UniProtKB/Swiss-Prot annotation:
Required for maturation of 30S ribosomal subunits. NCBIfam families: PRK00092.2-2. The lineage of its organism: Bacteria, Bacillati, Actinomycetota, Actinomycetes, Mycobacteriales. InterPro entries: Ribosome_maturation_RimP, RimP_C, RimP_C_sf, RimP_N, RimP_N_sf. Belongs to the RimP family. This is Ribosome maturation factor RimP. It is found in: Cytoplasm. One of its GO terms (biological process) is translation. The keyword ATP-binding does not apply. It comes from the Bacteria. It comes from Mycobacterium avium (strain 104). The gene is rimP.
Length: 178
């Protein structure tokens, strides 16, 4: 077994400032000492997502900082990536970053809601949901959300739906709020 790999906490402390200066936040660090070679995966996200160029830049910075650690005795693979589409939305920040995206939400009463993420406050998220042939905004208390996952879409959403979510046009949120 490879020894000398930093802990998750050490990686976050070492890289957190550098990532923050670049406008990103470390969401998670996964260290797999059993892989050959060992693997350190840093999951990062920002308000505008993490594109390939930003991931490459962060990876170079992270590699330089990690290489300075005296505790790493062996070769390792470093990966910097975004959380991915299947990451559950857990915090208000996650919902804010998913604004305009379609989500499936399981509520504490075991009901499910599918809608497009709109404005997110500290305690609630506005979901744009189907109301017959039209769209409506449903306020969901974040405390009632058991699970929320972004859905992959293969066709573009309706313009009215995007507008209610506050993306892609004029914001008519206040005009149509239930």
């Amino acid at each position: 077994m490879t020894t000398g790999l930093p802990s998750q906490t050490q990686v976050i402390e070492l890289l957190g400032g550098e990532f923050a200066r670049a406008g990103y936040e470390i969401e998670d660090v996964v260290i797999d000492a059993h892989a050959r070679p060992p693997r350190i995966t840093v999951i990062a996200d920002g308000d505008d997502g993490l594109d390939l160029d930003a991931a490459a830049t962060l990876s170079r910075s992270a590699s330089a900082l990690l290489d300075k650690l005296d505790t790493i005795e062996d070769h390792y693979v470093l990966e910097v990536s975004s959380p991915g589409v299947d990451r559950p939305l857990r915090t208000p920040k996650h919902f804010r970053r998913a604004r305009g995206r379609k989500v499936d939400v399981v509520l504490s009463d075991n009901s499910t809601v599918t809608g497009r993420v709109g404005e997110t406050g500290d305690d609630t998220v506005a979901l744009v949901v189907r109301a017959g042939r039209d769209w409506a905004i449903r306020e969901i208390p974040l405390g009632d959300v058991v699970k929320a996952v972004v859905q992959v879409e293969f066709s573009p959403p309706a313009q009215a739906e995007l507008e209610l979510a506050g993306v892609g046009g004029t914001d008519k949120t206040e005009e149509r709020r239930k």
